[in-house]
Amino acid sequence: MGEKLDKDSILYKKRHSIAHVMAEAVLELFPNTKIAIGPPIKDGFYYDFDFEKHISEDDLLLIEHKMREILKTGSPFIREVITREQALVLFKDEPYKIDLIQNFDVTDEITIYKSHKFTDLCRGPHVDNMNKLDPKAFKLTSIAGAYWRGNERNKMLSRIYGTLWNNEKDLKAYLKLQEEIKKRDHRKLGRELNLFSVHDEIGPGLIFFHPHGARIRALIENFWREEHFKNGYDILFTPHIGKSWLWETSGHLDFYKESMFEKIEMDRSDYYVKPMNCPFHIAIYNTDKHSYRDLPFRWAELGTVYRYEKIGAIHGTMRVRGFTQDDAHIICTYEQVNFEVREVLRFAIDMWNKFGFTNLKAYLSTKPEKAVGDDDDWQMAVKVLEKALIDFNIDFDIDEGGGAFYGPKIDLKIIDSLGRAWQMTTIQFDFNLPVRFKMTYTAEDGKEKRPFMIHRALLGSIERFFGILVEHYGGAFPVWLAPLQVVIIPVNSIVEEYALEVLSRFQNEGIRIKFDNYYNMRMNAKIRQYQSKKVPYMFIIGEREVVEGKISIRTRTNEQINGLELKEALEFVKLKISNKEIL
């Protein structure tokens, strides 16, 4: 589930076809509605409508019922090619269709599909007839707002989402998965576990990390730094803003301006907050002259960048306007490229394994039609990337012509505990910026040469990765990442002295531990409370534990471990942390 569908696949055709059936049902139930577009998408389909009156999710069952009535007709889906003039007449009362037609290229073939009483402007493809659509295998799932053509200056339409599968069994499996996804939604758990918040009155897409969330983030970042030092990287810190000439030179103002925040005018100069870290790292490189003996440079930064995401695209910590990229740039010679790419891929695999992600999938994107750089360099880079994937036994697909105009790349996806693929690591050659910024080094023969530059992000963005971690573990983080690892729960005040001794011993060993001496709550209620907060271990201390000098442990998974010596309990927890174990 969740993989992108090929247009020729039967499921793609079914989803496209059911979207037309939904549009017909809506028009029968709400006759003055104007229709926009209705494509198949990952896991389902949608259609955008301009309703005369407000509708809600309460209307979805009514629409579903009408759709099933239409399906009973078994009507065919008939494709016709028409002229531009015919299309303008046919859809004269549909302003959104007219807008589409008027923006077609004059050479475009215009096709329509007819089914039952409905005709739509559509390229297809579709199933042959409605008998191919199982009436028990689809469900309308939600309604959301969507701007026409995705432009916030246009009217907001009502987008009805649905899902369709080959049979009822697959539908039920999908809906069950969606229920689990809802339970694990990082926005929901973020509130329940007090991890982070968003304040639209301050600014949409800007994340406020609360103490527990900030603790997890700090643990991620500290681990990231330690691993980079172990792997021969140097850490950089660069500014958040730069003058316009920098972004003109890099090409961002020519090709990326729509995703950048507006300029800031001061001191008779224009500044922009940075959308990427690359030009700043190059500025550091160009501070000095370099010899081939100096290379490679492996420079990494947890650099905060800012991108003007549309309001409708913002989503929790996953899609934001201010975020921290775990960027690195490797600057090296031709002879060093093969080793450096292999090392980056090895580092990425190791990093993901330590965070609990062992199922990886890669995509290798090659040279597009329009590209900069030498053909030989492109061929070499693609071969190096492909060989690294093969050597590390990573399953990969080749996206022919799918590379950026400035270089080929590997995109590495992780598969989470719910089977969803998340694009995370990128290893990207850049044949553009070294030329734009005139980067050079002195080769062994004394001549000036252009270095190779490899962009590299492992986690992608810290904020997005944080959200993925929350959902992957359902908030029940591995012990090493848990913001609170242990809670001591004494049964009464009589045993507090021993409980405080345990607290001190564990604190001195760096364990994140809390002492709960609130006695107005029953013991079982306390345990349930901390289990709901996903705390890994609760130390229950009663009079027996005091007499024997031992500890009883209740885990968040409700496992009971009795009679551990204090030293044993300490070693038990420390081992779980050092091994990065998952409960």
Swiss-Prot record:
Cofactor needs: Zn(2+)
PROSITE patterns for this protein: AA_TRNA_LIGASE_II
SUPFAM superfamilies in alphabetical order: Class II aaRS ABD-related, Class II aaRS and biotin synthetases, ThrRS/AlaRS common domain
Catalytic as annotated region, ranges: 185-478
InterPro entries, sorted: aa-tRNA-synt_IIb (IPR002314), aa-tRNA-synth_II (IPR006195), aa-tRNA-synth_II/BPL/LPL (IPR045864), Anticodon-bd (IPR004154), Anticodon-bd_dom_sf (IPR036621), Thr-tRNA-ligase_IIa (IPR002320), Thr/Ala-tRNA-synth_IIc_edit (IPR018163), ThrRS_anticodon (IPR047246)
Positions of Zn(2+) binding: 278, 329, 455
Biological process (GO), any one: threonyl-tRNA aminoacylation
Enzyme class label: ligase
Protein name: Threonine--tRNA ligase
Coiled-coil annotated spans: none
UniProt keyword list: Aminoacyl-tRNA synthetase, ATP-binding, Cytoplasm, Ligase, Metal-binding, Nucleotide-binding, Protein biosynthesis, RNA-binding, tRNA-binding, Zinc
Subunit architecture: Homodimer.
EC number assigned by the record: 6.1.1.3
Keyword Cytoplasm appears in the UniProt entry: yes
Compartmental location: Cytoplasm
Function: Catalyzes the attachment of threonine to tRNA(Thr) in a two-step reaction: L-threonine is first activated by ATP to form Thr-AMP and then transferred to the acceptor end of tRNA(Thr). Also edits incorrectly charged L-seryl-tRNA(Thr).
Main location: cytoplasm
Protein family: Belongs to the class-II aminoacyl-tRNA synthetase family.
Gene Ontology terms: cellular component: cytoplasm
UniProt KW Metal-binding keyword: yes
One term of GO molecular function: threonine-tRNA ligase activity
Record note on cofactor: Binds 1 zinc ion per subunit.
Reactions that this protein is recorded to catalyse: tRNA(Thr) + L-threonine + ATP = L-threonyl-tRNA(Thr) + AMP + diphosphate + H(+)
